[in-house]
Amino acid sequence: MLQALTFFRGPQTWVLKSPQHSEQLPALTATFPDATVAFTHRDPVAVIQSTVTMMAYADRLRRTSIDPDWLINYWTDRIHRLLSAGVRDRDLVPAERSIDISFHQLNGNEITILESLYERAGVELTPGVRKSFERYLGSNPRGKHGSIRYDLQRHFGVSPEEVRSRFDFYFDRFDVRPEVGVRSGEN
């Protein structure tokens, strides 16, 4: 699809923000062999608790009942499949065309990481683009609109440690720090 769009619209640099690409690296690298890929890494427990909470809120709007067990099981399995494929296939993208960005490195260090990403991709980070990013970051601090309190145990009947135990392979491969359930159950 992207090749078809590029054909009609002329050559462009595509920026795709989706962790699902980690599950499709063989197809991505075969289709776009010169792609630069930024791999973002975060505690899967934080991702899962956010996803299942969001889905539960959405389900309240369109369903008469919610199945918390189904939500936690489905999304834990889904994220496990995605990350398993990403770990298995990560080396398909050579170091000179990829960068790994851990969530704990990103917060408060966005511009430095942005510079690294632009450099790796061979794209000029112009002063205007840098200023736009700085303006966006200044206007949108983390927690600007408040925060959501998560409680996997209470809402979904599973502890962060139970969920995390399925992802040792991911923590072993990448620089990922636990965010959930590591300080007296706080997120």
Predicted features along the sequence, with ranges:
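Conserved phosphate-donor/acceptor-positioning beta-strand/loop module used by diverse small-molecule
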Residues: K17, L28-T53
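Active-site-proximal structural scaffolding
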Residues: S18-H21, A30-P33, T40, I79, ...
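PAPS-dependent sulfotransferases, especially Golgi type II membrane carbohydrate sulfotransferases
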Residues: L2, R9-W14, T51-D100, H104-N187
